[in-house]
Curated annotation (Swiss-Prot):
Presence of keyword GTP-binding: no
Compartmental location: Nucleus
Enzyme Commission number, as recorded: 3.6.4.12
Similarity comment: family membership: Belongs to the RuvB family.
A GO term from the CC aspect: R2TP complex
Record key words, sorted: ATP-binding, DNA damage, DNA recombination, DNA repair, Helicase, Hydrolase, Nucleotide-binding, Nucleus, Transcription, Transcription regulation
Name used for this protein in its record: RuvB-like helicase 2
Coiled-coil blocks: none
Reactions it catalyzes: ATP + H2O = ADP + phosphate + H(+)
A Pfam short name: TIP49_C
Organism classification: Eukaryota, Amoebozoa, Evosea, Eumycetozoa, Dictyostelia
Species of origin: Dictyostelium discoideum
Name of the encoding gene: rvb2
GO MF term list: 3'-5' DNA helicase activity; ATP binding; ATP hydrolysis activity; DNA helicase activity
Entries under SUPFAM superfamilies matching the protein: Nucleic acid-binding proteins, P-loop containing nucleoside triphosphate hydrolases
Binding site for ATP: 73-80
Amino acid sequence: MSIPKISQVKDLTRIERIGAHSHIRGLGIDDSLEPREISQGMVGQVGARKAAGLILQMIKEGKIAGRAILIGGEPGTGKTAIAMGMAQSLGEKTPFTAIAASEIFSLEMSKTEALTQAFRRSIGVRIKEETEVICGEVVDIQIDRPATGSGAKVGKLTLKTTSMDALYDLGAKMIDSLTKEKVQNGDIIRIDKGTGKITKLGRSLSRVRDHEISGSKVNFIECPEGEIQQRRTETHTVSLHEIDVINSRAQGFFALFAGDIGEIKSEVREQINQKVAEWKEEGKAEIVPGVLFIDEVHMLDIECFSYLNRALEDDMSPILIIATNRGNTTIRGTDYKAPHGIPLDLLDRLLIINTQPYTEKDIYKILKIRCEEEDVDIQEDALQLLTKIGVETSLRYAIHLITSSSLVSVKRKGTDVSVDDIKKVYDLFVDVKRSTKYLKDYQDEYLYNSQPETTATKTNEEQQTMQTA
């Protein structure tokens, strides 16, 4: 007699992608715009967070539009983190677009077109629409199917509220929709008369004691009051860019999903602006100025900066937040130097927020938050060592060592990350300073190693040539 084998079932762990700023939930400020020491994933940068909170409050109140804010500071001081915190605090109702400055350089469209699309993605249009809906509890559904199976299906639907009940005749499409949504007696549904869309709101409270199997996600609600047929105002928020795409191509709405948008004619945008202005005057729509965040803004050239000067003066312009880690450097496309690599006429239009380098205490707290975010158990002395590494090298390098040291700990079947695990990955992966030192020590062994000629060297060579002549 053969013994049946029991197969072992492995647990499938859920894969979660953890980004560099996935631990940030907001700016971490209270109602009086005072930054908390540790809140919503944000640590330190008290002055910068307070300034960003003030800007955030003005954005929410709609008091400023067409303003630009520059976040400047050294690499690894949390510039992008502050922008992401602002995006999280604004919520989903306010459009937020984040791009890198190098994204606008493309062979398929011009630089100004890419910037225009980014600007219009950041401007929302909140459209109000009145619709007639039928809302009530399903009392009975009767569907008559033809015996031959070839004719059209007909049926009747009985709905009720606390005040009245009504009987509706059903066509074939409505019967299919009810079947698709698995509507049954006791469900509370809402039907949009214009589109025929059926929405299940939940189950009636009168059916709680019924002997039926219901899942944990079933929502029991009271029977609706008043009339079955009602008028309700629905609000839809779309960006100006989405309206541009729908009106710019023959395929219309499907161009949103195709991805191949290309350049949009200025005439189309002008017509859309006029239409939106009409809706605004009639009270059908309102403009929602959002936020456009451009990281590494020093990568833009002089033509892009000239476009930004003009775009910020437009009536429908979002809040522009730009970030850079450069000091006095050359403006791209010119031979002139300027602070942050930005022309002085644009700098004059900016509100500038400076970020300060993190202290050792701040780095310790940030690394602790990142360990919790990545579900890594780490010993206290190992965390102290990681903090010391972060102070001597960079915060990003220390954060990268968290995951790699966790993998080393798992391989040795440890429960948490120890000092030895940190030392092992520190030896395996070098930081920028050690890599630079290695290159200097062994530069003769590398191919094409040469020192760039300086102006002084060239001048000395020219003088020697003249003396020889």
